[in-house]
């Protein structure tokens, strides 16, 4: 029996490989892995979303590059992957939030909104003539005085996190989050942790390239952090990291000297 090469299964979105894989969905995930780093942190008094917009040309107008979007007063989304795909899903999320508000007279829950977006994503993995969305969204907001954070995968899978990251810097960021995150972390601490993670993922980070928003439990209102405040946070974080690196270097030198003795 002639073996069918793996490449034969990556042309149609609806065809599984013998290993049970949908190659087009995996390619969509790869688009996310190559995208800009986005971080979400759920804190006891609010939620933080932070993104490195990774602007490489001084000719680009920074305001034209959006990676964090307000969906409703109490909910926002950060994206990584194909920008055009993200825009379509953000528009749909805003529409769903407004339909729910007009129909029921109250805000849509964060989980319900995330599920609606994932339903759309999943449908685009099951029909011919379409392709998966090459983008992941971090959907975050306040539900009944509680910070909620969800990640939507190109396959349509939905996972709730305390803190997570998407994009090219995910491995570095997740290592730091798993080490530093606490259940009682405050919004101020979450902001500093998010900036620290972005700085570790990209040492050449610039304040004007960073987009950060918060939504507090107290008023459940979307708020963008000004670039001046981001600049101060980055300077504080870089100073702290430099001191830690210097201390580690001194410890290594002491250890080396003791071994030589």
Curated annotation (Swiss-Prot):
GO terms for molecular function: endopeptidase activity; threonine-type endopeptidase activity. Pfam families: Proteasome, Proteasome_A_N. GO terms for cellular component: cytoplasm; proteasome core complex, alpha-subunit complex. Signal peptide: none annotated. Transmembrane segments: none annotated. Keywords: Cytoplasm, Proteasome. The 20S proteasome core is composed of 14 alpha and 14 beta subunits that assemble into four stacked heptameric rings, resulting in a barrel-shaped structure. The two inner rings, each composed of seven catalytic beta subunits, are sandwiched by two outer rings, each composed of seven alpha subunits. The catalytic chamber with the active sites is on the inside of the barrel. Has a gated structure, the ends of the cylinder being occluded by the N-termini of the alpha-subunits. Is capped at one or both ends by the proteasome regulatory ATPase, PAN. Belongs to the peptidase T1A family. This is Proteasome subunit alpha. The gene is psmA.
């Amino acid at each position: 029996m002639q073996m069918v090469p793996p490449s034969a299964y990556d042309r149609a979105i609806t065809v599984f490989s013998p290993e049970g894989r949908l190659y087009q969905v995996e390619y969509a995930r790869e688009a996310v892995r190559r995208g800009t780093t986005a971080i979400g942190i759920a804190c006891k008094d609010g939620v933080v979303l932070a993104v490195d917009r990774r602007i490489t040309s001084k000719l680009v107008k920074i305001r034209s590059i959006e990676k964090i979007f307000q969906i409703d007063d109490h909910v926002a989304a950060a994206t990584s992957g194909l920008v055009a795909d993200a825009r379509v899903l953000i528009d749909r999320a805003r529409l769903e939030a407004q339909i729910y508000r007009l129909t029921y007279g109250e805000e849509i829950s964060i989980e319900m909104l995330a599920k609606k977006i994932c339903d759309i994503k999943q449908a685009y993995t099951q029909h011919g003539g379409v392709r998966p969305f090459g983008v992941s969204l971090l959907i975050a907001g306040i539900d009944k005085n509680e910070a909620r954070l969800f990640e939507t995968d190109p396959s349509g899978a939905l996972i709730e996190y305390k803190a997570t990251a998407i994009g090219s810097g995910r491995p570095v960021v997740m290592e730091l989050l798993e080490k530093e995150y606490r259940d009682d972390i405050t919004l101020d601490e979450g902001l500093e942790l998010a900036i620290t993670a972005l700085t570790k993922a990209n040492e050449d980070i610039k304040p004007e390239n960073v987009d950060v928003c918060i939504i507090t439990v107290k008023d459940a209102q979307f708020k963008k952090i000004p670039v001046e405040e981001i600049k101060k946070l980055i300077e504080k974080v870089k100073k702290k990291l430099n001191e830690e690196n210097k201390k580690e270097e001194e410890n290594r030198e002491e250890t080396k000297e003791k071994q030589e003795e």
